[in-house]
């Protein structure tokens, strides 16, 4: 039995609320159970120096957690003077996941910066961030379309992410913190709307896992991501 009493293939309650920030070109408040992330997408008429003059744009991401997003206060990374390795890893993952599904040439010489701020953490902050980031990005692209700033189809597909793991010997979908901290294996899957794989991160925490177990986790992830993509489409409709 899972601590949350969910079925092995059951997501936490998920909501994707678009357009929650007044000033941002795109925004989304994403909730995976008790994990809440505020995502904004900002359009900027600037590019990294190495991209200037190439006729295409860029999408990048930043990630951070509020000090009391967790059970005990975490020191702000700004006050420490540097980002943690975990933060750098996650924001790079978010950025490259989004870049796989956007037509950078259609974007023009502009940059969209996606900021993911974790308001409350209960496991799966990176997967919630990626799923909400697509909604914020789509919101920003629609803002641009309404102003005739882009003509071609900028977004080629959806992108969403979910965690899976082996808990008490059973493959389960969408781990919360209680499960993640006790799982024998945990993995994160990032996929497109049509089921193609962008990234797989898998780790054996207590004992190695088999190929069959990995495939079982992937099957759960595909099922969960299909549901998330449906929710994304409803959010931006």
UniProtKB/Swiss-Prot annotation:
CDD domains: RNase_PH_bact. Its EC number is 2.7.7.56. It catalyses: tRNA(n+1) + phosphate = tRNA(n) + a ribonucleoside 5'-diphosphate. GO terms for molecular function: 3'-5'-RNA exonuclease activity; RNA binding; tRNA binding; tRNA nucleotidyltransferase activity. Pfam families: RNase_PH, RNase_PH_C. Disulfide bonds: none annotated. Phosphate binds at residues 86, 124-126. One of its GO terms (biological process) is rRNA processing. SUPFAM superfamilies: Ribonuclease PH domain 2-like, Ribosomal protein S5 domain 2-like. Belongs to the RNase PH family. This is Ribonuclease PH. It comes from Bradyrhizobium diazoefficiens (strain JCM 10833 / BCRC 13528 / IAM 13628 / NBRC 14792 / USDA 110). The lineage of its organism: Bacteria, Pseudomonadati, Pseudomonadota, Alphaproteobacteria, Hyphomicrobiales.
């Amino acid at each position: 039995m899972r601590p949350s009493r969910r079925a092995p293939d059951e997501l936490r309650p998920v909501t994707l609320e678009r357009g929650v920030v007044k000033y941002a070109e795109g925004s989304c408040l994403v909730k995976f159970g008790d994990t809440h992330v505020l995502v904004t997408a900002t359009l900027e008429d600037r590019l990294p120096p190495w991209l200037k003059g190439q006729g295409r744009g860029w999408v990048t991401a930043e990630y951070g957690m509020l000090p009391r997003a967790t059970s005990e206060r975490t020191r702000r990374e700004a006050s420490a003077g540097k980002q943690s390795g975990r933060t750098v890893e996650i924001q790079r993952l978010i950025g490259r996941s989004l870049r796989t599904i956007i037509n950078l040439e259609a974007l023009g010489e502009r940059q969209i910066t996606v900021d993911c701020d974790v308001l409350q953490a209960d496991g799966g902050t990176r997967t919630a961030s990626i799923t909400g980031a697509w909604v914020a990005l789509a919101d920003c692209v629609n803002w641009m379309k309404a102003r005739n700033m882009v003509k071609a189809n900028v977004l080629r597909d959806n992108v969403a992410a979910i965690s899976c793991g082996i808990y008490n010997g059973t493959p389960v979908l969408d781990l919360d913190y209680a499960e993640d901290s006790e799982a024998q294996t945990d993995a994160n899957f990032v996929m497109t709307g049509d089921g193609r794989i962008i990234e797989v991160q898998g780790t054996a925490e207590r004992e190695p896992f088999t190929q069959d177990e990995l495939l079982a986790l992937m099957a759960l992830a595909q099922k969960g991501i299909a549901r998330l993509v449906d929710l994304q489409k409803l959010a931006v409709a």
